């Protein structure tokens, strides 16, 4: 069984992180839309299970995953978790029917730009 509470030092970067990470693409409504309450309950369960390494990206729900993760981690002690993300993809606002690639698989709420 993986130990989600054990922090280990990464051999090349010197960072400490848990053996298992939590990928947050589903919090950005990947394949299926979920409510904010469902996202929060999922994160609560992950935290209670010892999860402390979270991975996100701006592409996950066009920022929805990051927004939900931010709301959750805001009150957590900063030295208790590790957060990773990705950069480099330029996202341009477009209508849902104009989405291509991975973006068409996320059910993204409409936002005012």
Positions of the model-derived regions?
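N-terminal binding-site loop/beta-alpha segment at the start of enzyme catalytic domains
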Residues: 1-93, 97
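Glycine/proline-rich, positively charged
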Residues: 31, 99-113
